[in-house]
Structures are given as C-alpha cells and as structure tokens.
Amino acid sequence: MTGLGKRRPARSRSGVSGLRERRQPASVERSAGSEGRRELVIQGLAHDGRGVARDVDGKTVFVEGALPGERVQASVHRRRKRFDEAHVSEVIAASASRVAPPCRHYGSCGGCDLQHLSLEAQRDHKREVLRELLARQGIELPGASSLLADAGEGYRRRARIGVRVDSNGQVRLGFRARHSHRLVDLDDCPVLLPALSSLLRPLREQVESLEAPRHVGHLELLASDGAVTLVVRQLREHVADQRRWRAFAEAQGLHLGAWLGRESPRFEWLTPPPALHCRLTAGRRTLVLGLEPSDFLQANEAVNQRMVDTALSWLAPALSPVAPGTRVLDLFAGIGNFSLPLATQGAEVSAVEGSTAMVERLAGNAARNQVAVTARQADLNDAEACRRLLATTAPEVLVLDPPRSGAEALCRQLVEHPVPWVLYISCDPATLARDAAWLVSAGYVVRRSAVADMFAHTSHLESMLLLEHPDSARRQQGASTDG
C-alpha cells in the first residue's frame, strides 16, 4: 500500500542474525511441484515479517506466513545461492500468537504482511527489530522501548489506489498483489479509515463508467479534518470524463483534484480549491496545519499525535519554562509537525526543508498559529550545507525526521560539531542504526527510545531515539550559568 505524499525510497528486505537479503542475478528457480515442499520448524521472525528456518542441509529459508515456534509445510517458490524463499502451504503446529486475519484479501493483497500475527506480538516484534539493529552497531538501549500505538484497524488517512483495465475491459481497483505488479481488486480495506474504505466500490463503478478508463493511472485519497480529497492521475485530458469526475465528487461530497498529462503532469483543482488542514495538540494548544495533497502527512493521525507528545515530554528538561528561548533546529521539518508544537513550549525554532514550496507552507502554518518559527530552505543531503546550518544556528536541540535514506551527511557533521541533544525520528530502523552509530562514536549516549506502530499489520515501523552529548551539554550549561 503506497501512501500519498513524500516519495521515500523503498526499503530492502532484511533477515536475522546478520543475514541480509540481497538482490541476486536471475539464477532463480520457481518451484511448483512436490520437490519444492519441505517440513520446517520456524526459529525466528525476520525484520520483514517472514518466518526464518533452516532446512536439513542447514540452508536458511525465509517463509511467508510462518511464525516462530511453528511447524509448517512450506512450498519453496524461489531458490537463491545463500537462502531460499517459501510460503506456508500448511500449518502443522500453530503458534499461540497466530490469529485469523481481519481482512478477507490478506495473503493475496500485498498491503499487509503481519495480519496472521496478534497485534501484541506484532508490536513486540517491532521493538525487537529496533533493539537488534542497534545492537549490531554496538548500541545498547537504556531499557525497553516505549510503545506508541493505537487502533489496529481503521487508522489510515491516506492511500494511493491502483487502477488497471484488462484486455477485456474489466476494471481492477486496489493494491498490488504480493511480489507482483498485478492489482488485487478490493471492495473494502480494514486498515483504511471507514470514510476511505467505503469509497472503493463506488470508485470502481465510476472508473467503469468513464469513456476512457485506461487514461486513469491511479487514484489518491486523503482524509483531513472532516473532509475527503480525491486526486485523479489522468494520463490524458478528457473533457467528458472530467465532467463525470466532478459529478461523482459532488455526489460523494469530495474535494477533487487531478494530475493532468503523462510526461510533465500539472495539478489542477476540478472543484473549488479547499483549505485542507489537519490538527495537532501541544499541551493546551490546538494547532491547525494547512497542507496540499502532495505534501507529506503521516498516515496514522493518532500515532503521529503520540509521537509529538513523546517529543515534547522527552525534550521538556531542555525546554525549561524557567529559561525560555532554547535554540531548536528542526530538519526535514515538513509542514511543521514537530516545529510548531516545540515553538509553543517557548523554544526558538529554526525549521529547514529541501523544498521551497514546503518552506512557504511551513512559514504560513507558523503565522496562522501565531508561533515564532524561522523557516528556511537547504539541501540536507549536502555535508557543507549541514555544517553551515549547525554553525549559524548553534542549536541546543536538534530534531531530525528524515526520509528512509536517513541523515548520514548531517550525523557525520555532528561528530565534529556536537549538539547537546538530538531527537531522531526514523521511518527506517536500518538507516537509524547506521546514523546512530556515527553519533555514539562521537560520544553521544542514547537516553530514550520508542517504537511507533504507524502501520499496524505491516512490518513497517517508525522509531524515536533521544541522544545526549554529555560533554556538549555540560559546556552549554556552563555557558548558560556564566551568562
């Protein structure tokens, strides 16, 4: 299931105990007969949610749909030099953590990969993934990671829906099948907000009614404060079909936009341009953040609020109301998800984004909420730009919320130019562990950790680390006392 907003590079799948899956040449065999079936005992769970076993020859086998402790009949569908890939054909002895999937499409739809595992066990697994990846870098957590979680269903407020028309003219609308570009036709999706899930069947009927359904590339859905926005990716403009889309949006009570054209698409509102926004709370304040359909917005509103609450709680000692004006540098700041709440606590916030349009949106959100945030643009993948930012802002607190590629350029700069406190919010624990290793090598100490279950029923996890540089913090305290 692909989200609406910031494009983040795809994660590579990872194994356990240091074994990481690598892309192999086409020396791959797809097995279908009984010679590809094996009885296996599952020893663990890989980071991507697959069971891990070893066959009679000691070769590692990754098994989709299998859980630790289970004995299964597995069908090998791909052989590689260092490991095989398989899927469960029969569960002989089931784990106590195995549950019935809440979605009837589970197993064919590729949007979720952990629905057969209880929600509690999913979250324990995600905590263990973070602990193990950090341990591989020699980093020990000070205690169990906090869990930031909410409902397991009906939580997702944005989604990209694929559209395909086959050679017989049949419309398929849904998400990609597992390991395939084929679409699984969906009438509902239990992880979507009900307001979005209920649109899947009407949307298919709408595409079927178009004169040129093959001109529809995909559909994007976004739920924001009491309204739903539909964005149509229209590969070729079609005036009659645009009229049909407007009528559909009016009947369903939707905001409607479209990306028009194939090579250099332009965005256009097909209904009156709305003032889209979402809300955050920061202490006693309610903040209203404006956004556009293409902006990055966390898919799970409730878990995002828990992450913001956690950031404010962890940083409270550094944001003492006795001494307001703590200098905070927020990098990859987006529309102000962390910048604005921190500013309400009296911090002097400088927020940085790579996109000029996003900087303007962030500045507008600060003005709308009457909080003092300085927004600026910089290339955060450029080491020299990162060095200049650290030098010119001299932050006491650094907040990082990078894409999946992480923030290695910046973390390398922090080795030479340490900041007393670093709050790192990550959507990929592997790049978080890599970057945290740079910081720990420079004297930083991990003080707090949390796992955010942003995408329940999937192996994806978000995490937070709070790191302190004790020497830098002491120097900062001394400077404040002298002042």
Curated annotation (Swiss-Prot):
One GO MF term attached to the UniProt entry: iron ion binding
Residue positions binding [4Fe-4S] cluster: 103, 109, 112, 189
Binding site for S-adenosyl-L-methionine: 298, 332, 337, 353, 379, 401
UniProt entry keywords in alphabetical sequence: 4Fe-4S, Iron, Iron-sulfur, Metal-binding, Methyltransferase, rRNA processing, S-adenosyl-L-methionine, Transferase
SUPFAM superfamilies recorded: Nucleic acid-binding proteins, S-adenosyl-L-methionine-dependent methyltransferases
Active-site residues from the entry: 427
Region (Disordered): 1-36
Catalyzed reactions: uridine(1939) in 23S rRNA + S-adenosyl-L-methionine = 5-methyluridine(1939) in 23S rRNA + S-adenosyl-L-homocysteine + H(+)
Gene3D superfamilies: 2.40.50.1070, Nucleic acid-binding proteins, Vaccinia Virus protein VP39
EC number: 2.1.1.190
Coiled-coil region list: none
Recorded family membership: Belongs to the class I-like SAM-binding methyltransferase superfamily. RNA M5U methyltransferase family. RlmD subfamily.
PANTHER family attached to this UniProt entry: 23S RRNA (URACIL(1939)-C(5))-METHYLTRANSFERASE RLMD (PTHR11061:SF49), RNA M5U METHYLTRANSFERASE (PTHR11061)
Biological role: Catalyzes the formation of 5-methyl-uridine at position 1939 (m5U1939) in 23S rRNA.
Protein name in the entry: 23S rRNA (uracil(1939)-C(5))-methyltransferase RlmD
Organism annotation: Halomonas elongata (strain ATCC 33173 / DSM 2581 / NBRC 15536 / NCIMB 2198 / 1H9)
Source taxonomy: Bacteria, Pseudomonadati, Pseudomonadota, Gammaproteobacteria, Oceanospirillales
Name of the coding gene: rlmD
